[in-house]
Structures are given as C-alpha cells and as structure tokens.
Curated annotation (Swiss-Prot):
EC number of this enzyme: 3.1.3.-
Entry's Gene Ontology cellular component terms: extracellular region
Chief location: secreted
Species this protein is from: Salmonella bongori
Protein name stated in the entry: Inositol phosphate phosphatase SopB
Motif placement: CX5R motif: 315-321
Family under the similarity heading: Belongs to the phosphatase IpgD/SopB family.
Keywords: Hydrolase, Secreted, Virulence
Active site: 315
Amino acid sequence: PAQEAHQVAVAAFREAQVQYLNNQPWQTIKNTLTHNGYRYTNTQCPAADMKIGAQDIFPNAYQGKGVCSSDTTNTQHATNLWMSTLSVNENGKDKTLFCGIRHGVLSPYHVKDPILRQVGAENRAREVLTAALFSQPALLTKALQDEVVSLRLVSVGLLTTSTIVGNEDAMVQDQMRAWQSLTQPGNVIHLNIRNKEGELRTVKIKPEIAAFNTGVNELTLKLGLGHQASDNYNIGALHQLLGHDLRPEAPPGGWVGEWLAQHPDNHAVVNTLVRQIKDIWNSKLHHTDGNEPYKFAQRLAILAHEIGAVPAWNCKSGKDRTGMQDAEIKREVISLHQKATLTPLASLPDSDGQEIFQKVLLNSGNLEIQKQNTGGAGNKVLKNLPPEVLNLSYQRRIGDANIWQLVKGLSSLVTS
C-alpha cells in the first residue's frame, strides 16, 4: 500500500507539473545576433502564435497555451510544436535564410491502447502538416481559396531505433505509420484551418512526405544501436528525395531532380548538399560521430529548404536533440551566407565557425524552449561521460568550455 500511495503521489505531481507548464503563456521567442557586420534574427514561433487573424489556425485552438514535452498522453495536439526561422537584414529588408517545423515525437507513447495511440499520432501528424502549410504563405493562401495544393515535407526523426535500450523504436514505428496513413498515393487530405475572420475552413492538400530517422546520441554513434532499423526507413525516403541512383556521380532524380530542372541557374548549393548526403549514405558516415554528430540530419533539413520543401525534425521531447539540430542548421546557414560555401563533410568548425556556433547556441531561442518545457534552461545533449571515448564531439565543436557549460545549463537536473 505504501508503494502504491507513493506511485499515485508521483503521478499526481507529474500531472500537476504538466498542467502548469502547458498553461503558461507560450509566446514567440525572438533573438538577434551579429557576425561580421550582418544582423541575424532567430524566431521560434509556437503553435499558439501561428495565426492568420486574432486566433491560432488550429481547429482545436491552443488559446495562447502549449503542450510541453512531458505531456506524453496528449492525443489531440502535437508536442512542443514550433516554427523555427532564421532571417538576415539586408538593405533594410528581412530576408529568410531558413524556415522549418520542429516538434516532439508524433507518438503519444504513454497511451497504452494501441488504437487510441495511433489515432493520437495521426492527429499530431495533421497538426505538423498544418504548421508546415502555415510556413508556406503562398501555398496557404491558395489552399484557403479552395485550390488543392501539394505539400512536400522532409521529416527527420532524431531517435534511437533500438529495441535494447529505451522505447524509441516503438515511438518511431508509431510516427512512420502516422506519416504513411496521410500519404497514400494520390491521397487528398482535408485539414481544418482557422482563417483571418476566425472561421474554420476546410483546405485540401496532397501531402508527400520523405520520412527519415537518424540517431544522433551516444547509443547510436558510439555503441552502434539502431542503425539497421533507421536505415530501412531512410532508403525509401532517399529515393523520394534524390531518386533511385544513389551513386555520387549520378545526377539527382526525385524531388531534387525536379527542382533542378525548374531552377537550372541556382544549383551549386543543392548539388553540393546532394553529393555530401550521398557520401554520408554510401560510406555510412551517419553511423558514427566523425566530428559531426548531426551531419546527415542537418544536411537533409537544409536541402529540403533549398528545394522549396518544408523541413521538419523531431526527437522524443522536441527540445534537446531537436534543439541541437536547430542550432547546427543555423550555424551552417549563417556560415553559408557569410562564405557562400558549405562546410566540408566530417569537419570541426574553424575558429570563425565556432564563434558563429557559440552565438547561435546562446541566441537561437533553444534555451528558452527548454525552460518553457521543463522550468530549467539547458541542453541534455551536452554531457561528460566517465569513459571519455563515449563523449560526442561537442566540446571540440563549440570550442569554449564556459559556453559549453552555459548551454548544458540545468539539463542534468530536470526530468523529461
């Protein structure tokens, strides 16, 4: 009885904590950083602030609130859903350099009933698609004018698909099933979106989703867990994105090939990313740290943006691995904007790159998102494990012990 009472008390406390965190105001986070005379703005817009009019666009309105990463049984809303944007001020105007959608895993993984859990995962997937449509204003306008619009999404899961440790393999299965259920060939799905008058409108979209998963933690990159299960998903997604011939010298097919045919003058960055992604895949470089834990995930997201698809990425909670992916993307996009070339594969940032990374880690909104979800700012990706050989390359990538500690913050003290 004492043990039972303790379990009930713990569950009640956790539920109260979830309600408290969900019911805080969830508001847009905006930070700026300057580098070599350019001023960059990082904007993290939560679902509650995705608005055309006075209310958010979702049929089940957020009303200024949110869904924190500990809310693992929510079958109505996606967890920790944000639109992440990087822009630069050029000639007095803001120019978007990158925009994508970040979230927690689609699986409401503490729901025991498998049917209800799958319904919840599909509801969450619909919200991510709604956010993706919101991130493409021209498409959204067409959809609200009763046009059937095609929406391409590159989903990059960052979970460890191991059946030995943790339960992330089952979560990824739920997520992949949810994406699959919404993307049958020729399938038109209906989403309800609140327009600027606050009325619910049914829009029709044809979603195409290239769904990847690539583990980025020590279990995957140091102990080799989960590669086979993830790569079984990744091969089909790569064929969608790049076509069936994945030899480095082969011209890209798939979505990239279509985009290149329509944009023949703007292909240097796209072709370099394609070559790097093929090299990663063919040499299995995403199976190890190799100075760059997020090498595959980051390039997939940047490539998606470059070809006009919507990049989306997630881990379990949507705050730590997801936050590091967000920072790695923005570091590279700022570096590309400054130097007009991409960083070579499997390399540590140079001193200028480290300076950009440090500024991004502190000014990208990720510390604030972590605090919004747990009450404490800090990224769990950064840790010092006793056998040095198990540590990821983040101390060397960041290059400053004080900033490493600031970004790590309170992460080891918070739950979820």
